[in-house]
Amino acid sequence: MSWYRPLLPAAVLIPLLAACSAPASDPVGGKAAPGFPYTVSNCGVTTTYQAPPKRAVTMNQHVTEVMLALGLQKSLVGTAYLDDAVLPAYKKAYDAVPVLAKEYPSKEALLAANPDFVYGGYASAFDAKAGRSRDDLKRSGIASRLNTEYCPSGATGLDDVYREVDEVGRTFGVPDRAAAWTREARAGVTATEKRLKGTAPVSVFVYDSGDKTAFTAGGKGIGNELITRAGGRNVFADLDKTFGDATWEQVVARKPDVIVIYDYGSTTVEQKKRRLLDDPALREVPAVKNRRFAVLPLSDAVLGVRAPGAVGKLADQLHPAAR
């Protein structure tokens, strides 16, 4: 049986003090909240928080779920951009947060929420052309954080998930919640690895999207580590990107045993399967020939709180005999 049990948000939140930005305001009464001031470097931006932010906006689902996993819904004044359904454990909390836009909000809509902190999941959340760059926000007195999967660095993995949760927990004054979540997440991954002991890895091609080319998971993103820990071998691990394009000729040459389909957006899993099955050029690819498909929601395969549980979910599909 695979492990997945999202940490339920705490019922009682630590009281939030004055808003933090750059420059940060002073805490109430001049006394620092426990754990503050807190200085963190994130994707090249260093910020000192004098107190937990109290008017946060999240853009992109996986960072929204980080906040909800830590019981921080009362710190949210807005959210935007879902890829798929919010986890059931977080739905009630999510429904209480104003949705600023179906995708990214305009600069005007974002500023109208009067945030003191903006948390983006992808670099596109901080689009300079749309007036939402981190520098733009800083000039407006708003602190920001970018999910570390999109920082210019090396390959990311589950340790980066734990660090992301820890840093967000510290930023909002709830480090104990972050530590509790991480302990549970690590235990689940360990349990999956134990039951896979002795199984031979299967070769995996991730099909995210694409027609003329295949948009796939490369070796730098967390999706690559999820495959490895779930008992697979990413056939495009040599692609030096989180996501990137591969030719269909490369897919054929690398002969994947299983195709993992990322589920999101308006194109359904069945439509993606049909595109692969109907392509005569892919007919002899083992995964296509044997109709071996696995499915993960996109939100499972990015750097967020779903990633540790996704190891077990994917392992069940790659190695059903080891369930």
Model-inferred region functions:
Residues 1-64, 170-207, 317-323:
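Bacterial Sec-exported substrate-binding components of ABC uptake systems
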Residues 42-44, 98-108, 239-247:
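Short helix-initiation/N-cap motifs at beta->coil->alpha
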Residues 50-53, 60, 64, 107, ...:
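Extracytoplasmic/secreted envelope proteins and their assembly/folding machinery
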Residues 55-113, 117, 122-126, 235:
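A short, structured surface patch at a secondary-structure boundary
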Residues 60, 122-125, 149, 239, ...:
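Short secondary-structure boundary segments
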Residues 83-85, 216-244:
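Alpha-helical, coiled-coil/dimerization segments enriched in small aliphatic residues
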Residues 85, 124-132, 142-167, 200-222, ...:
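Extracytoplasmic ligand-binding site segments that recognize negatively charged/polar headgroups
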Residues 155-164, 170, 258-323:
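Structured C-terminal subdomain patch of bacterial secreted/periplasmic proteins
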